[in-house]
A protein has these predicted regions:
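N-terminal pre-domain segments of enzymes
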Residues: 37-75
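Core domains of carbohydrate- and sulfate-ester-processing enzymes
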Residues: 77-123, 188-193
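Accessory beta-strand-rich segments of carbohydrate-active enzymes
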Residues: 83-86, 116-193
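Bacterial N-terminal signal peptides that target proteins for export
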Residues: 13-22
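C-terminal segment of classical bacterial N-terminal signal peptides
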Residues: 29-36
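Sec-dependent N-terminal signal peptides
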Residues: 21-29
Length: 193
């Protein structure tokens, strides 16, 4: 009969095709996710020291930069950060894909940073997440930088908290108003040299 549709049954062949498409899609998604999951690894530089061989990326210069005044509650954010090359004056986006890892506080030109890259375009985005300890909640939280060469624009959870220009001087921002009540906080820093 013309104009009539076949019964709403799905053949075994159609089910097999759907399963195959789902399997391929999952493999592709896994591959994309794995490609974005970059691990930090120290590069081999022209002059490596014994100190660099024993460096613990989970505890980099743990006592530095320590606030000048003694405080019980503070966090050291040295360690592995996400990194991506930026274009000059690029606006922040939560959708950025960070394709490298860098060991902070080392400059990206150094082997120990894990990047060892020189570029005419010295604009980068640094990113990491952190969780504010219970003991610090409800208090003003200051984010200190020992130095950023040359310009830094700092975002916390997508909100711009400040801009600093000048390569060799310490600075800080009060980030309290940009923090979420609970959970992970995102810290993103645009750096232009």
């Amino acid at each position: 009969m013309r104009g009539e549709h076949a019964p709403a049954s799905i053949s075994k062949m159609t089910i097999m095709k759907i399963k195959h498409m789902i399997a391929v899609s999952l493999l592709l998604l896994t591959g994309i996710r794995t490609a974005n999951a970059v691990e930090w690894q120290m590069k081999q530089g022209p002059m490596m020291t014994p100190w660099s061989e024993t460096l613990d990326p989970e505890n980099v210069l743990g006592e530095y930069p320590r606030p000048q005044m003694e405080r019980q509650e503070w966090m050291n954010l040295n360690g592995i950060w996400d990194l991506r090359k930026a274009i000059q004056d690029e606006a922040y986006s939560p959708d950025f894909i960070y394709d490298k890892k860098i060991l902070v506080p080392f400059p990206l030109e150094s082997a120990i940073s894990g990047v060892m890259e020189e570029s005419d375009n010295q604009c980068y985005w640094y990113r990491r997440t952190l969780t504010i300890p219970e003991s610090m909640k409800g208090k003003n939280i200051l984010l200190h930088f020992d130095a950023v060469d040359w310009e830094a624009i700092v975002y916390v959870n997508g909100k711009k908290v400040g801009k600093h220009t000048g390569g060799y001087d310490p600075f800080y921002f009060d980030i309290t108003s940009a923090l979420k009540q609970d959970g992970e906080q995102e810290l993103a820093v645009y750096v232009r040299d």
